[in-house]
Amino acid sequence: MGISVGDLLSMDFFKDFHVIAGHKGLNREIQGVSFLEVPEGHRWSIGKELIFTSGYIFAEFEGYLDKFCENFIPSHAALVIKRGSYLDKIPEKLIEIYDRNSIPLITMPYSPSWMTVVNQVNVGVLNHAI
């Protein structure tokens, strides 16, 4: 058993994380963490992950956004994009697909390290499971 996206986001550490789409899916379960930074990265998803990205995959690989949306597999808990990294603006197509599938699309501050964020997710998942 994991923790819901909504419960995780209610933890103080996540106060500057903002849900921009998929609000109806805040009850989705998180059991772990994954990253999406390379074109084949979506193949490694096994479900119920909170997927993090800097946005590099969408900014630097021409056509990947379309491919991602066409092959969208709604098994992950949510997607978190680091603000101010590679995307000036979250693509409208991404917002639409997350809203349509009721999967939270979340933005996070630029400053926290991946290790710090992953540790906080793990704390939330483990504390909720105990």
Q: What is the role of each PLM region?
A:
Residues 1-130:
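Alpha-helical/coil-rich non-catalytic "connector" segments in signaling and regulatory proteins
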